[in-house]
Amino acid sequence: MAIMDAKTTFSNQQSVVVSSGGSVVCGSTVWSGAIASGGGQVVDQGKAGDAVGQELTLKVAAGATAIVGGGAAAALQVVLQTADSNVDSAFKDLVLSPAVTVGSAGFKGSLFECRVPAGAKRYLRVVYKNSGAAITSGTINAYLTRDL
């Protein structure tokens, strides 16, 4: 099991209900205390740089409520974004996961895991993109850890 730190948590039981073709951003505020259940935030690494020997792994999984789509084609893609400043327009895609079909029966379990690649800047955030039928219910957890 991974060690979770509030400062490196993007989403804590955050809703991913989104219309077809829509997106949910993990949040726009930087950690200032414990992240509330249902909330999301931007992670501030303190400075840019490639942490050789201290690599971080992004882990994203369905939360307590299964992710359910409005049809069999409902799919969710995880996008890790990075920026020098915490301004929406500054964030650029760093890693894109394959789209995971969540379907109408519901999805529980891991959606995506990857090492944060070289080139990450000071601020990181996660965006959940829907590439199929609407997502009608579900929560998600996403965080950084040193575990793989």
Identify the function of each model-found stretch.
Residues M1-L148:
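Surface-exposed, low-hydrophobicity beta-strand/loop segments enriched in small/polar/acidic residues
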